[in-house]
Amino acid sequence: MEGVEDIPGPCLHEGLDWTWESFGEYLTALERRKHDIDFCALLPHGPLRVYVMGDRAMNLENANQDDIARMRQITADAVRAGAFGFSTSRTIAHKTLAGEHMPTLRAQEAELTGIALGLKDAGAGFIEMTSDWNTPDPATEFAMVRRVMEACGRPLVFSLNQRHDRTTAWMDLLELSTQAS
């Protein structure tokens, strides 16, 4: 959160009770605090991946079948506990405070599908995704994401950004979305 959302570490450490481990315990910790706005919580892919895979996640290694099964179960449990869904990042713009890429940057289709199936298992939730849409190109990555969504039958929302180096990318993504709907 310090690197991606630019929230200072002291604010995070002082503002949250860090005695929880599961997503349900996290939601309970949030409920104990006074808050002035309504919000929903999504299970974040980065911490999920690091929790399951450890250093292998930070080294951008591929998840194995055991990792995927565990992430699927944790996702289903999180949604049943109250998570609105799952969020992932596939953009080089999101980096840790140390400037390293997020552990989710190049997560493979099998991993994303496994996690998405956790939403299906729970019968609820959506996927939120931020991407550069460049692995290797927007149409190919969108096709992969579409297969993930078809496997789980849950909705997807994604950030639509204008890029200086690809001025029509947003229109291309809207066209791909229209074709998918």
Stretches with model-predicted labels:
Residues 1-86:
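Divalent-metal coordination cores built from histidine and acidic residues
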